[in-house]
Amino acid sequence: MAEDLDELLDEVESKFCRPDPLRLGTVERPRGGGGGFFGHDQNRAEAKENLRSAETFEKEDDLDSLINEIFEEPHFDKKHFKLKSKSSGNTSVRASIQGLGKSCSPVYIGGSTVPCGIGTNASPRACDHLRCTACDFWVESYDDYRWDKSCDYLFFRNNMPEFHKLKTKLVKKKGTRAYACQCSWKAVEELTDLQTDHQLRWVCGKH
C-alpha cells in the first residue's frame, strides 16, 4: 500500500511539481545526510496537499451528482422540497397541529337538509364524526330514512354497520336522517342539540 502511494505521489510530482533546475542547485543538501535534497521533500509535501485537495473536490463532485440524481427522480416533487428557516418551520408545524382534532361545540344532529361539518353556535352543523361512549362505536347516519318502530337493541348489535342488513329496518322519509350505533338509534328532521337528549351518549369524535 505504501509503495503504491509513493508511486502515485511520484507521478503527481512529475506532472504538477517539477522543480526548477536553477533552484535545485541552491537548496541541495549533502549526500551524506540520507541522499536527495530539501527541495524534493518540500515538493513531496506539496504534492500530498494537492492530492488531498483533489480528493476533496472529487468527493464534492460526487455529492453534487447524488443530489442532482435525487432531484431528477420521476416521483420527486420539487414543489414540496423547500428549505425553511427554523422560525417559519415551527410556525407551520404549530398551525398544522392546531388544524387537527377540532370538536363540535355544541354537538348537533339534524335532518338530511341540515349540512354536516364542525358545529358551533355561530355555524350550527350536524356532526358527522359522532362516537358513542357507551358501546365505543362510530355512529352511522342515513339521509332521507327513518328507523322502523320494530327496531330493538339486538338488531343494531348484530347488524351494525352493514347497510345491506340495516336497510331491512329503514323506511324512506324525505328530509329525515337516521342515526345509529350498536346500542342506540334515533331519526331526526330538525337541528337538535345532543345536550337536550340525555338518553344518547354520543359525542363528537373530532374532525
From Swiss-Prot:
Expression sites (tissue/organ): Expressed in the retina (at protein level).
Q: Where in the cell is it found?
A: Cytoplasm; Photoreceptor inner segment
Question: What do the Gene Ontology cellular component annotations say?
Answer: cytoplasm; cytosol; photoreceptor inner segment
GO terms under biological process: photoreceptor cell morphogenesis
Annotated keywords:
Cytoplasm
- The region called Required for interaction with FAM161A is annotated at 1-75
InterPro entries for this protein: CFAP418
User: Which Cys pairs does UniProt list as disulfide-bonded?
Assistant: none
Tell me, in one coarse class, where this protein mainly resides. cytoplasm
- Name any one Pfam family assigned in the record: RMP
Q: What does this protein do?
A: May be involved in photoreceptor outer segment disk morphogenesis.
Q: Subunit structure, per the record?
A: Interacts (via N-terminus) with FAM161A (via central region); the interaction is direct.
Official protein name in the record: Cilia- and flagella-associated protein 418
What is the originating organism of this protein? Bos taurus (Bovine)
Q: Which gene encodes it?
A: CFAP418
